[in-house]
Amino acid sequence: MPETLIKVDLTKSAYENDKVHNRWHPDIPMVEWVNPGDDFIIETYDWTGGFIKNNDSADDVRDIDLSIVHFLSGPIGVKGAEPGDLLVVDLLDVGPLKESLWGFNGFFSKQNGGGFLTDHFPLAQKSIWDIKGLYTSSRHVPGVNFAGLIHPGLIGCLPDPKLLSTWNERETALIATNPTRVPGLANPPFAPTAHAGQAKGDVKAKIGAEGARTVPPREHGGNCDIKDLSRGSKIYFPVYVPGGGLSMGDLHFSQGDGEITFC
């Protein structure tokens, strides 16, 4: 059995786990190192770090602070990987945590996040789905039972300083074209809720001030939400920093490409 490099404790805040982070920045320290060709297991939180609960109220979806997301396990360094290389990642298997066999779907409130269909569905809604093997069903959507295709919505490598600067400049300019749009066109760095993994002191503060938010996909991978990136997939990532810095999270049991189901 491969070694589990990163574990999560669902009874504690994700901020207490120094092997996860919720921003992209070249100075986030590697939490583990592996050799090329190594097999390993990593556990992840859901994208909210456990904020959404298994209950019948959508208040948590309505009230979530969206600046905390996404909580990613990593970064993991690969020995010998250097800028300019391609990091090849084989997803050998993907599955839910045995102690948490459920997931959720929902609509954000128009007052907090919005979505593609926010004018049609302005109020927060949530459904809980119980996972039984390959299938799922929901007490909130009676009569539906279907097989999922489990995949990480978010997987990628750390940017270098130049790429990070490009992202922040590009997204700042995009926001300025329509700063009041709901949902927003992009999300700028936001230090108060940044989790910089094992970074300390001035480095932690720098990551908070400059770290790119994890919402969009970018040149390094990121929040691609490609449903076919499941078990058996082979993914090629450009390496920007020594070691690459692979991170992943935002696991989905079932979702269409692009994540428009969470509208």
Model-identified regions with their sequence ranges:
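N-terminal, Lys/Arg-enriched amphipathic/low-complexity engagement segments
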Residues: P2-I64
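Short, structured beta-strand/loop micro-motifs enriched in basic residues and often containing a Trp
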Residues: Y15-H25, D65-S73, A212-H220
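Short, conserved secondary-structure segments in the cores of folded domains
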Residues: V20, M30, G74-G77, D225
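Loop/turn positions that initiate beta-strands
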Residues: G37, A81-G84, G232
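A generic structural signal for residues embedded in beta-strands
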Residues: I42, L86-V89, F237
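Intrinsically disordered, low-complexity linker/loop segments enriched in Gly/Pro
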Residues: D93-S230, Y236
